[in-house]
Amino acid sequence: MQTKLSVALAAALAGFALGAQAANVEVYGLVDTGLNYQHVDADRSGVDDISRFQMKSSQSTPNRWGLRGTEDIGPGLKMGFLLESQFGSDDGSLTGNRLFQRAAQIMLMSDDYGTLVLGRSGMLRSGHGTTGLWGGNIAPFSNSWGDYMVGSKYVMPGGFAPGDNTITYQSPVMSGLQVHLQYSNQLDAVGADDWEEEGKNSTDRQWAVGATYTSGPVHVVAVLDSVLYGRTDETGGYDPDDSLSFSLGATYDFGFMKLYASGMYFSDMLAREFQSHNDMDSMLGGEGVSYKGYSLQLGTTVPAWGGTVKANLGWMDASVDHEYLASDVYEYGDTDRIGFSLGYVYPLSKMAEVYVGAGVTKDSANATLRADDSSADPIAYEVLSGLLVRF
């Protein structure tokens, strides 16, 4: 597999090198590697606390390299492309076993009519590619730092990834307002089972409508999205209700500090849409269950000592919405999650920076195991530091 990927990569680079004079083509990327300490108390009888010290990559920002380019094809009209890969710099692994895991998209851009994007693209409620609206635009730690430093994806379920077979339309910017429309005909074609068919109700699809508004120090993002779930083993073969979520976020730059605030309402979110911490043994990994609830985040960045201080507080309340499997085996339950993160980034040069951070995440789970009722309050602590280089 790796040999095939290497051959494909070499061919792609050779092709782009030959065409570089005809279009504006750029190679770019970043490498983020550091050290990490975690302590996890699962608050479960018979489950030992876990303490570990390890090297990790992509702690503050996911590692990547990519190719992007544009070409003028007429008055006010351009064609463009974006190919973006993600990898582990601690072990050299390829994320998700995909050559271009983060983005593989082609774009038609018109000054008058907006932009059309086709291919594997960031969902609107993500920070991926040219189509993601969330990420670092709306939270100081983007999706997260490390494993337990709370960012959006650990308190807001679903949507923080690219999707396959995606079409996105971005309107022209009008008085600071831009509209975004998106539809994925099959969210994960690579991981799909043989019986899943693109565009059919046998596979997961997704639609989203978003809007952004920017005026001076104010930036606002709103996204309404829904996963059209296919029939899965997770729901015993039943066709689960489609999820629905509404997310709203805003930032305000005061100059001496930048304030971030965001919130989300969600319903019918299957358990797999939650980025739960397995070591914490929270109940959000329960099978055959969907959830509804709310999430809130409040954060800030402050220039200090030549760098930037970051802080973020996140909270989520998720309660069982629907139960699709009646079994004595599966464990699930309502869960509250709260987390706090504090970090500092210091630039060493135009390309390099050093960062440090610490965070704590705590779940309060009222679990239901049909043979027994129980609850748990797992908690995790994390301290990390690393170096990041852009090119």
Regions found by a protein language model. Name each.
Residues 77-79, 112-116, 176-179, 217-222, ...:
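Repeated loop/turn-to-beta-strand initiation elements of outer-membrane beta-barrel proteins
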Residues 377-391:
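Outer-membrane beta-barrel "beta-signal"
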Residues 29-37, 83-85, 120, 181-183, ...:
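Transmembrane beta-barrel strands of outer-membrane/channel proteins
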Residues 69-71, 108-110, 171-172, 213-215, ...:
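Residue-level signature of outer-membrane beta-barrel architecture
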Residues 61-65, 102-106, 163-167, 205-209, ...:
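Hydrophobic, lipid-facing positions within transmembrane beta-strands of outer-membrane proteins
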Residues 1-22:
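Gram-negative bacterial Sec-dependent N-terminal signal peptides
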Residues 23-37, 52-188, 203, 212-219:
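Outer membrane beta-barrel
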Residues 208-342:
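Detector for outer-membrane/organellar transmembrane beta-barrel domains
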